[in-house]
């Protein structure tokens, strides 16, 4: 399915969010592993497994044609030889949609965990789990602070 090679997990993550912004389902699915054991959970959604369910869910999300911008912040990355886990905050804005006061709509931030597996064809996403961020966004991490999730 995928002819693209992502030399690092960060390259795969960048390609995932770029495809989301462009509304390019094929480019987004090229980031995912071809394994049937992939998992995706959208905010408030059920657990989806396998290529068919994951692809169908993203096709529905991208079908309305809204152009979104995603700013990733608060990234914590943990990497090993064969696996990488990225915890991020996804900050969305929707272009062209206007609220009642004429300002861009800005949905609440989303916290997401993306898991990447190193394969013979480069790094591939195997898990994307996203949930609404509770309350206020946490402040940016300072240099030298611990990189511990819990």
Named regions from a protein language model:
Residues 1-33, 37-150:
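A beta-strand edge to alpha-helix "cap/lid" segment located at domain peripheries
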């Amino acid at each position: 399915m995928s002819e693209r090679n992502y030399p690092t997990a960060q390259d795969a993550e960048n390609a995932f969010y770029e495809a989301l912004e462009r509304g390019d389902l094929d480019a987004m699915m090229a980031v995912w592993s071809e394994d049937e054991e992939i998992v995706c959970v959208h905010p408030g959604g059920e657990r989806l497994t396998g290529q068919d369910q994951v692809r169908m869910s993203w096709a529905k999300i991208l079908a309305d044609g809204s152009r979104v911008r995603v700013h990733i912040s608060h990234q914590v990355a943990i990497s090993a030889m064969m696996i990488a886990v990225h915890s991020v905050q996804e900050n969305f804005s929707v272009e062209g949609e206007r609220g009642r006061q004429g300002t861009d709509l800005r949905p609440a931030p989303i916290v997401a965990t993306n898991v990447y597996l190193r394969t013979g064809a480069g790094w591939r996403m195997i898990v994307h789990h996203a949930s609404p961020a509770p309350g206020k966004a946490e402040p940016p991490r300072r240099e030298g602070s611990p990189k511990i999730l819990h």
